[in-house]
Amino acid sequence: MQRLWVTGYRSYELNVFGDKDPKIIIIKYALKNYFKGLLENDQLDWIITGANLGVEQWTAEVGLELGQKYPLRTSIMIPYEKFADRWNENNQTKFLNLKERVDFFASTSNLPYQNPVQLRNYQNFMLQHTDRALMVYDTEHPGKSKYDYNLIQKYQKAEEYPLDLIDFYDLQDVAEEYQEAHQRNYFSE
């Protein structure tokens, strides 16, 4: 069984403040292409991600979409109970919708947020229950995901644990590829 931890930027770190932002289309396109490459080589059974607004929720959406065509399951893990309680109503609704649709949902702590140990326990759980990681993350532009990135780097010194990055250069390439593909489709209709 091949399990992939996916994490990355929060939506606000990418200046994405609405569901219609074109950056979301490009990031989802990049994720979908990455996942399809693994799926077509029998290297992916589970996508395991968090519930943060941004890359993690977009990952769950793409995983659910691909799960209709491929033998792929999607899991959302959260570091503590009542994770989304402080979010606005729209974001809470999106969270609850994803929670209901994924193949597996759980919290690594049965308590509401108490202290940073819960976050470290969550990270350790993700490392120990996955075989590799993908981050939408650029080391030249650190964000909150730098903690995950640094922990994975440290973990790799003791364990074989592949980490792939989709950075801003990759996203620019994907945007150009997406635009070309959609222009071809437009003109061929």
Curated annotation (Swiss-Prot):
It comes from the Bacteria. Gene3D superfamilies: 3.40.50.450. Pfam families: YpsA (PF06908). Signal peptide: none annotated. Belongs to the UPF0398 family. This is UPF0398 protein lhv_1265.
